[in-house]
Structures are given as structure tokens and as C-alpha cells.
């Protein structure tokens, strides 16, 4: 299901622990890492899609997390043509996403990457809040950074800004 502009509605999930570290999933049989995300089905609300994707990709249920916040608007990224299925070329531009910031209220052992028959991830780790941005595939990077910035400034009081984090990394003070 695409909107008029060629974007597929989607949700992204930034799952944090009590140390404000983020869940980082390793894609099955790949060396790439990302946040959980997935499409919104027709008739499904973004929140319902978020809980479905959270279970399908991470094995967590609503009782394992608390919604801290979500982005105000859709964040969009274009997918390069060489990444688009041949049958979609010409109509598909990319994804538009509502991002959710969640707090894990359960335990690490509640994570189950094999909750469904078609796992998205075969590994996971907790990561510093800002650190994953540089590891994201380049065409998604601005959306990831935009979501992390908006959600941290609105909902994570006292969180170091991305600019301060980046300056610290450049100076070698990790």
C-alpha cells in the first residue's frame, strides 16, 4: 500500500533500556544492524502496527514495554532505484515512518528473536543512544538521526545532544 507520493506507511521502533541504551538488531544473514521497523497494514493504526512489529521482530509484547513518545509527523526516506523491486519501479519512492520511543519494562531475557517463523534479526545488543547512527545504511541515516533527535529532545530529559556526542567522538573523548 503506497500513498499518492509513492511512500509506504511504516513504523520505526527505538527501544531503550533503563540506561537509555538502544536496542540494535542484526539483520538475518547480513552484517547490517538497524532498529525494528515494518509496514502498516491497511486499516491498522500506527500504534497497532508498532506492537505487531515489536512482537514479530523482537518477540516482546505490550506488557514488556512502555510507550514514552512518538514523532509528531511522518519522517520519509527515498530508496535508491537499485534497491527497489523491478515491479515497483516508477511508483515506489520509499518509506514514510512514524517512530515510537519505547522503554523496556520487562527483562532482556524477554527478547525472543525467533517468536515467529520468519525472523528479521539473528542477533541483538544494547548500544549507546547516538552511536548506531553512523552504522545505518546511508539512505536511512537522516531519518534515524531525525527520529533520535526529536524523541530525545522531547522525552529524554538530560540526554546529551547529538552535536555534543559527535564533537566528543571527534576529540577522542568516547
From Swiss-Prot:
Its EC number is 3.6.1.-. A motif (Nudix box) lies at residues 38-59. Keywords: Hydrolase. Signal peptide: none annotated. It is an enzyme of class 3 (hydrolase). Residues 6-149 form the Nudix hydrolase domain. One of its GO terms (molecular function) is pyrophosphatase activity. The keyword rRNA-binding does not apply. InterPro entries: Nudix_hydrolase, NUDIX_hydrolase-like_dom_sf, NUDIX_hydrolase_CS, NUDIX_hydrolase_dom, RppH. It holds the Pfam family NUDIX. Its cofactor is a divalent metal cation. Accelerates the degradation of transcripts by removing pyrophosphate from the 5'-end of triphosphorylated RNA, leading to a more labile monophosphorylated state that can stimulate subsequent ribonuclease cleavage. PANTHER family: ADP-RIBOSE PYROPHOSPHATASE (PTHR43736), DIHYDRONEOPTERIN TRIPHOSPHATE DIPHOSPHATASE (PTHR43736:SF1). Belongs to the Nudix hydrolase family. RppH subfamily. This is RNA pyrophosphohydrolase. It comes from Neisseria meningitidis serogroup C / serotype 2a (strain ATCC 700532 / DSM 15464 / FAM18). The lineage of its organism: Bacteria, Pseudomonadati, Pseudomonadota, Betaproteobacteria, Neisseriales.
Amino acid at each position: 500500500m503506497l500513498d499518492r507520493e509513492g511512500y509506504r506507511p511504516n513504523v520505526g521502533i527505538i527501544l531503550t533500556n533503563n540506561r537509555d541504551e538502544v536496542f540494535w538488531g542484526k539483520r538475518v544473514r547480513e552484517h547490517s544492524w538497524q532498529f525494528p521497523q515494518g509496514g502498516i497494514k491497511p486499516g491498522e493504526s500506527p500504534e497497532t502496527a508498532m506492537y505487531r512489529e515489536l512482537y514479530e521482530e523482537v518477540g516482546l509484547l505490550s506488557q514488556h514495554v512502555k510507550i514514552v513518545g512518538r514523532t509528531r509527523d511522518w519522517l520519509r526516506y527515498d530508496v535508491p532505484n537499485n534497491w527497489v523491486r523491478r515491479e515497483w519501479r516508477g511508483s515506489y519512492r520509499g518509506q514514510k515512518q512514524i517512530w515510537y520511543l519505547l522503554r523496556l519494562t520487562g527483562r532482556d531475557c524477554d527478547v525472543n528473536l525467533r517468536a515467529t517463523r520468519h525472523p528479521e534479526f539473528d542477533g541483538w545488543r544494547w548500544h549507546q543512544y547516538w552511536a548506531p547512527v553512523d552504522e545505518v545504511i546511508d539512505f536511512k541515516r537522516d531519518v534515524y538521526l531525525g527520529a533520535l533527535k526529536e524523541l530525545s529532545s522531547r522525552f529524554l530529559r538530560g540526554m546529551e545532544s547529538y552535536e555534543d556526542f559527535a564533537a566528543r567522538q571527534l576529540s577522542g573523548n568516547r
